């Protein structure tokens, strides 16, 4: 058996020698490269936290000590060390999640993979333990960009206010912009600054100086300033101590012995401690280290030797279509600028940034700031395009409502990964946007069905300068173009049964192919259908109620929550127009969806042509029976 195969839980790490730990780290990296290459996933971040994860589990007693991971995509090594080594179905249906999962293990605490939240969690858990007199440590691991999020600093401010509440923060600093201060001096200072004697000497010195008549206070302030200046010169993270946190580091994040020693000393300290570990994203895998873009942050199925993708390509992605079109628009209009929140490449703005470096801003993990800054840009005479993942726009709802919409700012939001994303699980599905945003006055929402519509609707959106607009599209490759056969108002008619159609299928965006297939199945049963793409789903097209009145049933199909979504808006529009036609809503139920392929998730929740056609057919049959009963 390999060294890794002998690790069934954290306790198995305790007896390993320094040489064996080094061997284990090499095995883990080799395992990760080959396992993640088979399934896809977050490779670079996990290659960077191998030694850090081992040191944590040697120094602490999980699950009694609670180890919390921010941006949980860096928890693969943690999974391996806590008895989860079957990565054969990582991020696949029935397999391990790509993030921590309480269902998988008692060692996992936070399932949410939205960044910058772990310090708030840690603050609450530490308070709960203090109030209830429970033993054990709370350890929060934050990094991979998560400290760019404002929530992290709000939490730090609160954590620092409790000088007597033990809490250990581990900063996994894998940013290449930091200058490493590694070696004997840093390790010596790390040892010194967490000892009780160091604290006692500081307290004694302060007391003596402040008691000295006339010059005592001035002398203390001068010496304190000198100490701070020296500290900041060698460790620029002195701002942490200015908050009131005990700062330790920087420490070599690949030196297990140094980290374990720092962790054990931190356990003895009686207040909040921040340990700064310098790690290398993609460590041990040359292709990742050579990849300047993001050090193989996320990879698809690939050959681990050549790094060539093995999954078949089904054509251009929605992201690439957007990325190319926004560049063309930027060439035509100098007032169009772009903003993203730590997602420049994933949302397709990298080409825009290369072409117009002075017209794009990556604000870090700060969606709220992105929205407000966009409002300022719009007020200043520009048209900002804010591109983020759909699930992350949830964070900026108040700013979109009160800063963008209230001020009627011409801002275009582009939501990538909208609807069911699949393998990344519950917190990455973009299934709430069309429900949450229904209440925003003046906002217009577009859901393009194909690449041609994405290009057209993006241009329509940036032409609006007195209200916010929004486009949404999924993660998958773009399918073939779906032509319109007719137009009603602003809607595209995709299919029309020639004689007295009974069912009006309202296809929201990428659900158009599903609706066309459902219509084909229904017509095989003698039920004629009309299929329309509303294009702009908010506000509801004023022509829709009149078209609905020509049918016996309206069915709205959307890859969004059924609660308060497009179907609910259509039902309200028909009610307001006094059109007495029932509306069936097909969408995502009110539940968090387990990770699986997008097609598997859609099948599980009934968003397939067969399921939709069957339920519509059954509903019409029931309606006919009820009508007959009334006549009798």
Curated annotation (Swiss-Prot):
Pfam families the UniProt entry points to: DXP_synthase_N, Transket_pyr, Transketolase_C
Cofactor notes: Binds 1 Mg(2+) ion per subunit. Binds 1 thiamine pyrophosphate per subunit.
Transmembrane regions listed in the UniProt entry: none
Amino-acid positions noted as binding Mg(2+) in the UniProt annotation, renumbered to this chain: 144, 174
GO MF, one example: magnesium ion binding
GO biological process, one term: isopentenyl diphosphate biosynthetic process, methylerythritol 4-phosphate pathway
Main function: Catalyzes the acyloin condensation reaction between C atoms 2 and 3 of pyruvate and glyceraldehyde 3-phosphate to yield 1-deoxy-D-xylulose-5-phosphate (DXP).
Family: Belongs to the transketolase family. DXPS subfamily.
Subunit structure: Homodimer.
Listed name of the protein: 1-deoxy-D-xylulose-5-phosphate synthase 1
Source organism: Streptomyces avermitilis (strain ATCC 31267 / DSM 46492 / JCM 5070 / NBRC 14893 / NCIMB 12804 / NRRL 8165 / MA-4680)
Lineage, highest ranks first: Bacteria, Bacillati, Actinomycetota, Actinomycetes, Kitasatosporales
Gene this protein is translated from: dxs1
């Amino acid at each position: 058996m390999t060294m890794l195969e002998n690790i069934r839980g954290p306790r198995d790490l305790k007896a390993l020698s320094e040489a064996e730990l080094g061997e284990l780290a090499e095995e883990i990296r080799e395992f990760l490269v080959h396992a993640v290459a088979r399934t896809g996933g977050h490779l670079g971040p996990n290659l960077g936290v191998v030694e850090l994860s081992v040191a944590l589990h040697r120094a602490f007693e999980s699950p009694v000590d609670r180890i919390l991971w921010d941006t949980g995509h860096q928890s693969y090594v943690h999974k391996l060390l806590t008895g989860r080594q079957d990565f054969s179905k990582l991020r696949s249906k029935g397999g391990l999640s790509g993030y921590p999962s309480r269902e998988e293990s008692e060692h996992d605490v936070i399932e949410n993979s939205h960044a910058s939240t772990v310090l708030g969690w840690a603050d609450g858990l530490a308070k709960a333990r203090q109030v209830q007199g429970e033993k054990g440590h709370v350890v929060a691991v934050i990094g991979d960009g998560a400290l760019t999020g404002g929530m992290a600093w709000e939490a730090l401010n609160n954590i620092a206010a409790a000088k007597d509440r033990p809490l250990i923060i581990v900063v996994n600093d894998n940013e290449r912009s930091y200058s490493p201060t590694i070696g004997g001096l840093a390790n010596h200072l790390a040892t010194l600054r967490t000892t009780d004697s160091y604290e006692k000497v500081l307290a004694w010195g302060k007391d003596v100086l402040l008691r000295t008549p006339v010059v005592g206070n001035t002398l203390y302030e001068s010496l304190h300033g000198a100490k701070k200046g020296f500290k900041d010169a060698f460790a620029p993270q002195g701002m942490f101590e200015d908050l009131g946190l005990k700062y330790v580091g920087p420490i070599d994040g690949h030196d297990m012995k140094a980290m374990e020693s720092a962790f054990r000393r931190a356990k003895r300290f009686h207040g909040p401690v921040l340990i700064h570990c310098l790690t290398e994203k993609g460590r041990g895998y040359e292709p990742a280290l050579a990849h300047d873009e993001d050090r193989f942050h996320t990879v698809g199925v690939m050959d681990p030797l050549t790094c060539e993708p093995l999954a078949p390509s089904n054509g251009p992605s929605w992201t690439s279509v957007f990325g190319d079109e926004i560049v063309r628009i930027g060439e035509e209009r100098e007032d169009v600028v772009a903003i993203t929140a730590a997602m420049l490449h994933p949302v397709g703005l990298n080409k825009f940034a290369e072409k117009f470096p002075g017209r794009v801003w990556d604000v870090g993990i700060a969606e709220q700031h992105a929205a407000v800054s966009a409002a300022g840009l719009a007020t200043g005479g520009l048209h900002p395009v804010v591109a983020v993942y759909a699930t992350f726009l949830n964070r900026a709802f108040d700013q979109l409502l009160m800063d963008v919409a209230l001020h009627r700012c011409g801002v275009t939001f582009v939501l990538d990964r909208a609807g069911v994303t699949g393998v990344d699980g519950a917190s990455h599905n973009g299934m709430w946007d069309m429900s949450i945003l229904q209440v925003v006055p003046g906002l217009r929402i577009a859901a393009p069905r194909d690449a041609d519509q994405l290009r057209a609707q993006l241009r329509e959106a940036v032409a609006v300068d007195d209200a916010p607009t929004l486009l949404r599209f999924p993660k998958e490759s773009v399918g073939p173009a779906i032509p319109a056969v007719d137009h009603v108002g602003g809607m595209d008619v995709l299919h029309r049964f020639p004689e007295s159609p009974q069912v009006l299928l309202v296809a929201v965006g990428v659900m158009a192919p599903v609706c066309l297939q459902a219509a084909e199945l229904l017509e095989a049963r003698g039920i004629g259908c009309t299929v329309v793409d509303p294009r702009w789903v908010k506000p509801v097209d004023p022509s829709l109620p009149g078209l609905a009145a020509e049918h016996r049933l309206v069915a709205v199909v959307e890859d969004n929550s059924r609660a308060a979504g497009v179907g609910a808006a259509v039902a309200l529009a028909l009610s307001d127009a006094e059109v007495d036609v029932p509306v069936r809503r097909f969408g995502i139920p009110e539940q968090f969806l387990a990770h699986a392929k997008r097609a598997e998730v859609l099948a599980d929740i009934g968003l397939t042509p067969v399921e939709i056609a069957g339920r519509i057919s059954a509903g019409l049959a029931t309606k006919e029976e009820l009508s007959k009963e009334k006549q009798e």
